[in-house]
Amino acid sequence: MQVDLLSSAQSAHALHLFHQHSPLVHCMTNDVVQTFTANTLLALGASPAMVIETEEASQFAAIASALLINVGTLTQPRAQAMRAAVEQAKSSQTRWTLDPVAVGALDYRRHFCHELLSFKPAAIRGNASEIMALAGIANGGRGVDTTDAAANAIPAAQTLARETGAIVVVTGEVDYVTDGHRIIGIHGGDPLMTKVVGTGCALSAVVAACCALPGDTLENVASACHWMKQAGERAVARSEGPGSFVPHFLDALWQLTQEVQA
């Protein structure tokens, strides 16, 4: 199994495209992470929108550049709105991304996520346990936390990618991004990133935005992982713990965009 690396030039090119196109991202995400997700997208140059009412969600999915479905705080009314948005996204050819939070631990969201797979997401982003559960290989995880190493989920990610046509991202100490054939590994980041709620969910929003960019979607999505890890490393070097990490992280994302424009 060959795992390729992403070059700095590829990452910089994707970030230039990101800033140039400034995707409008319809984020149907969980209640815990909305502000952090919106600020992450803004720092990178995208435009976030959090539209959740069923009728509006369907309407907005038709005009957005990309759609994110994150099931972290799933309810039946929210599932109805998400389903309507995904149906409209498919009809309007709006590329959408699934973040199957805790899908291995809870039946309702697992069935819902499996239902959504028939609408062909452009990307799926989860930790190892979530990706393995979604692929039907295991029902693991401890709530939103993984109990598996990212590398162990690569075969499941490849299978899921081939079955759905999605780019699948497995996040961990090393992030792995695959289209079912090629695999890109992204090293970096810092363990402190796991002590801040929302870094993974925010990454899913950036992944969704990258799916709207022209060019190689696999490389664009892998670049999203690279930017987040880069920013995490820079933020950790300047912070004293989780509380001071967040503002430094947002600053680091902003600085990355300034560097590619210089």
Swiss-Prot record:
Catalytic activity, reaction form: 5-(2-hydroxyethyl)-4-methylthiazole + ATP = 4-methyl-5-(2-phosphooxyethyl)-thiazole + ADP + H(+)
Function statement: Catalyzes the phosphorylation of the hydroxyl group of 4-methyl-5-beta-hydroxyethylthiazole (THZ).
Protein name: Hydroxyethylthiazole kinase
Pfam families noted in UniProt: HK (PF02110)
Family: Belongs to the Thz kinase family.
Binding site for ATP: R125, T171
Alphabetical UniProt keywords: ATP-binding, Kinase, Magnesium, Metal-binding, Nucleotide-binding, Thiamine biosynthesis, Transferase
